[in-house]
């Protein structure tokens, strides 16, 4: 399966809030969940929805998600927690959480168009894994700084997780440490994803 490029509000109505996918919210009167799906949910459907939440929020393909689950399964710690740490430490997600991009697809585009430097080097791979003490900056040209300035101005500084710090004047972000489970930006039961 390829990356999802279809209507985003349909996915939000179906799966609930996905802040990484879009900032838009559906109208309060148009709740398709209550209209079509009543009664008891089956276990398979619950697990599938949790997996789809993870996929659409982080903008992953099915194969990428399976690869991350495989890597997390080899770790000695809790598989679900390691999976979330791997996904949260991706460069595109880190840019989104810093407020340098309004959505994860927007952050992915910034990285692909070579506007972002990590430790002074251009990185154009959105799945680049950030490590503690990595410094994330914008390129030194005006266009790159304008793109990031608009996103920082519209972001909420109170939502910045504890493992990241940002200098809004120099458009510079710092990864302090590896993320704790309580600072994940998505309400999800990661064990159901691993079981799926």
Curated annotation (Swiss-Prot):
Matching SMART domains: Ribosomal_S4 (SM01390), S4 (SM00363)
What this protein is called in its record is: Small ribosomal subunit protein uS4c
Q: Could you tell me which NCBIfam families the record lists for this protein?
A: PRK05327.1, rpsD_bact
Q: Which HAMAP family match?
A: Ribosomal_uS4_B
Principal subcellular localisation of the protein = plastid
Q: Which GO terms describe its cellular component?
A: chloroplast; small ribosomal subunit
Describe its partners and assembly state. Answer: Part of the 30S ribosomal subunit. Contacts protein S5. The interaction surface between S4 and S5 is involved in control of translational fidelity.
| Stretch list, region Disordered | 16-40
The entry's localization annotation reads:
Plastid, Chloroplast
Gene that codes for this? rps4
In Gene Ontology terms, what is one molecular function of this protein?
rRNA binding
Free-text function comment from the UniProt entry: One of the primary rRNA binding proteins, it binds directly to 16S rRNA where it nucleates assembly of the body of the 30S subunit. With S5 and S12 plays an important role in translational accuracy.
Q: Name one GO biological process term.
A: translation
The organism's taxonomic lineage, starting at the top: Eukaryota, Viridiplantae, Streptophyta, Embryophyta, Tracheophyta
Pinpoint the S4 RNA-binding domain residues. Answer: 89-152
- State the species of origin: Anthoxanthum odoratum (Sweet vernal grass)
Which PANTHER family does this entry report, sorted A to Z?
Answer: 30S 40S RIBOSOMAL PROTEIN, SMALL RIBOSOMAL SUBUNIT PROTEIN US4M
**Family annotation (InterPro entries):** Ribosomal_uS4 (IPR022801), Ribosomal_uS4_bac-type (IPR005709), Ribosomal_uS4_CS (IPR018079), Ribosomal_uS4_N (IPR001912), S4_RNA-bd (IPR002942), S4_RNA-bd_sf (IPR036986)
Q: Does the keyword Transport apply?
A: no
What's this protein's family per the entry? Answer: Belongs to the universal ribosomal protein uS4 family.
Q: Establish whether keyword Ligase is in the entry.
A: no
Q: Which domain of life is it from?
A: Eukaryota
Which keywords does this Swiss-Prot/TrEMBL entry list?
Chloroplast, Plastid, Ribonucleoprotein, Ribosomal protein, RNA-binding, rRNA-binding
